[in-house]
UniProtKB/Swiss-Prot annotation:
Organism for this UniProt entry: Homo sapiens
Predominant localisation class: other
Name of the molecule in the record: Vacuolar ATPase assembly protein VMA22
Superkingdom of the organism of origin: Eukaryota
Gene this chain is encoded by: VMA22
PANTHER family: COILED-COIL DOMAIN-CONTAINING PROTEIN 115 (PTHR31996:SF2)
């Protein structure tokens, strides 16, 4: 009876793994299409604005990321990756900025001007009226970044499923030495 339950669990795990692999293949195809679309739109923008108008010379001297990648623990110890806007703080970052005791009397520090919470849109580096193809390139790469995080999470789930599959196969071999 235990071997029968183990085989049923093994079958359901194989079906889940195959579904995840199919989803991974689809997301990789979409990611490749988004990246290709982004580079093509960037080439169109360079053609429209001129090769020297869209290039590294127009980048800001001080760049800040617009998005960050956060890894979090999901069920069964799996890591799940998520793309988060840079201005959004994680719950563990909320709180007092200085640790320790404060001196209430005495010399006061002048607060340092902090950068704005929301980073500036990088498209403004190339002028106010940028071509639509440059905005399309930015959107394509942004979608690609989200897809890359989804693919990384899915790949972790597939690796976890494969290790579970191997463990169940070993248990089945121990229960039925002549089978499997």
């Amino acid at each position: 009876m235990a071997a029968l339950d183990l085989r049923a669990e093994l079958d359901s795990l194989v079906l889940q793994l195959l579904g995840d692999l199919e989803e991974l293949e689809g997301k990789r195809t979409v990611l490749n299409a988004r990246v290709e679309e982004g580079w093509l739109s960037l080439a169109k923008a360079r053609y429209a604005m001129g090769a020297k108008s869209v290039g590294p010379l127009q980048y800001a001297s001080h760049m800040e990321p617009q998005v960050c990648l956060h890894a979090s623990e999901a069920q069964e110890g799996l890591q799940k990756f998520k793309v988060v806007r840079a201005g959004v703080h994680a719950p563990e970052e909320v709180g007092p900025r200085e640790a320790g005791l404060r001196r209430r009397k005495g010399p006061t520090k002048t607060p340092e001007p902090e950068s704005s919470e929301a980073p500036q849109d990088p498209l403004n580096w190339f002028g106010i009226l940028v071509p639509h193809s440059l905005r399309q390139a930015q959107a394509s790469f942004r979608d690609g970044l989200q897809l890359a995080a989804d693919i990384a999470s899915l790949q972790n789930r597939i690796d976890w499923g494969r290790s579970q599959l191997r463990g169940l196969q070993e248990k089945l071999k121990q229960l039925e030495p002549g089978a499997a």
